[in-house]
Regions:
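Alpha-helical DNA-contacting segments of helix-turn-helix folds
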Residues: 65, 73-79
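C-terminal peripheral helix-coil segments that are non-catalytic and often amphipathic
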Residues: 1-16, 110, 114, 143-156, ...
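Key DNA-contact positions within bacterial/archaeal DNA-binding proteins
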Residues: 59
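Short coil/turn segments at alpha/beta junctions that flank glycine-rich nucleotide-binding fingerprints
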Residues: 39-43, 93-94, 115, 156
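Basic, helix-initiating cap at the start of DNA-binding domains
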Residues: 1-40, 44-56, 69-73
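Hydrophobic alpha-helical connector segments
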Residues: 74, 85-114, 165, 169-172
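Short secondary-structure transition hinges
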Residues: 103, 109-151, 155-158, 166-169
Length: 227
């Protein structure tokens, strides 16, 4: 999908008011919108703010979306779809329960690194709108699926069973989700350059080391105790 600003004169370069390309894909637009929501807050951000940040007019923006609720849904669904994909992939794993659990912890951490602005936005939702409530319900489903994996590994005697699986789930996601507070890809802001789309995150050796540290800390602490 391509989203264009109002057409300039034929001999004018195709740039927006701020010097950015006047033609956006939907992913480009959602990246800019996510940045504005993170910086201003969803409730405080207006369609005027979103149009100004994207270099579109409000009328052009409304031509392609019904309002900021739709844009919020597109942004948080990017995170949720990636998380759902982790569990769809896990369901195809034929390994032991603890290996499937390790796979999910690793992949959810990789998703957070790759989709940092969108996961950050998801974690800031408070359920004030229908879109937010729908997203939070999907997030609870992700929590429940992880809890099921934890229980399976406990039942198989592969991780310690003296801790409530629901608490284990909260602690695992708490460790992973805490990355949004301090992790910065390449040492830069996770929200992209001011007024521009969030650049895709390319995994680095540092990213891989962080992912591995999360997996090892989580799983080493859960290993079944041997008398």
């Amino acid at each position: 999908m391509s989203i264009a600003a109002d057409p300039p004169p034929e001999d004018a370069p195709r740039v927006s008011r701020r010097g950015r390309p006047a033609r956006y894909t939907q992913d480009d637009l959602v990246a800019v919108v996510a940045q504005v929501f993170l910086e201003r807050g969803y409730d405080a951000a207006s369609m005027e703010d979103l149009a100004r940040a994207s270099g579109l007019t409000k009328s052009s923006l409304y031509h392609h979306v019904s309002g900021k609720e739709q844009l919020l849904r597109l942004a948080v669904n990017r995170a949720l779809d990636a998380l759902d994909g982790v569990f769809e992939d896990e369901a195809r794993q034929a390994d032991s329960p603890v290996r499937r659990l390790e796979h999910v912890v690793r992949r959810t951490t990789e998703v957070l690194v790759a989709e940092l602005p969108y996961v950050t936005l998801l974690l800031r939702l408070r359920g004030n709108t229908e879109v937010e409530r729908e997203a939070l319900e999907r997030r609870r489903s992700v929590d429940a699926r992880l809890a099921g994996l934890v229980q399976d590994a406990m039942d198989a005697g592969q991780i310690r069973s003296d801790i409530d699986p629901r608490l284990v789930t909260r602690l695992l996601f708490g460790m992973v989700n805490s990355l949004v507070e301090w992790y910065r890809p390449g040492g830069h802001s996770p929200h992209g350059p001011a007024g521009g789309p969030v650049a895709p995150t390319v995994p680095t050796s540092r990213d891989e080391a962080i992912v591995q540290a999360v997996v090892e800390l989580a799983l080493d602490g859960l290993h079944a105790r041997r008398d």
